[in-house]
């Protein structure tokens, strides 16, 4: 057998042995995540907007698990804060001042001024902006969370945040907050 083939076989066996060793070590020393962090993250809206003061929903969920206030998520609103309060076993708190007084807004791109640089698309955490390079962009308002992250990267300043009027189609129905009386057959008579 030539020396090249022997070297290839030895390197293959060595790679196989190290791969098996790494696989075993990964299972043996696996770090389990905190389930509270995972549950808190699942409750957050996943907009990664940073309005809470953290770079994304996962870091904010970690901070909540370590005792941070649960009322810093404007896109999640009161419903998310109440679910977080229930999860953490704390009393619900009013949303922070800037979150509560803030009117829901969505991004609006003045398409005639858009140069198609795609910087807003890259900044949008929920993929609510459509467009391609050197073509105008537009916002899918149903997907826009109003996080405001697309405004700053725009080099021609053609993105505005406009307030959304509440209509029957976009109004937040709090169905779990409406009192419902269950009437049994016996109490009808």
Curated annotation (Swiss-Prot):
InterPro entries: 4Fe-4S_dom (IPR007202), 4Fe4S_Fe-S-bd (IPR017896), 4Fe4S_Fe_S_CS (IPR017900), Elect_transpt_cplx_RnfB/RsxB (IPR010207), RnfB/RsxB_Proteobac (IPR016463), RnfB_subfamily (IPR050294). The gene is rnfB. Disulfide bonds: none annotated. It is found in: Cell inner membrane. Belongs to the 4Fe4S bacterial-type ferredoxin family. RnfB subfamily. Residues 1-26 are annotated as: Hydrophobic. One of its GO terms (cellular component) is plasma membrane. Its EC number is 7.-.-.-. Its cofactor is [4Fe-4S] cluster. Residues 32-90 form the 4Fe-4S domain. Keywords: 4Fe-4S, Cell inner membrane, Cell membrane, Electron transport, Iron, Iron-sulfur, Membrane, Metal-binding, Repeat, Translocase, Transport. SUPFAM superfamilies: 4Fe-4S ferredoxins. The keyword Metal-binding applies. PROSITE patterns: 4FE4S, 4FE4S_FER_1, 4FE4S_FER_2. This is Ion-translocating oxidoreductase complex subunit B. GO terms for molecular function: 4 iron, 4 sulfur cluster binding; electron transfer activity; metal ion binding. The complex is composed of six subunits: RnfA, RnfB, RnfC, RnfD, RnfE and RnfG.
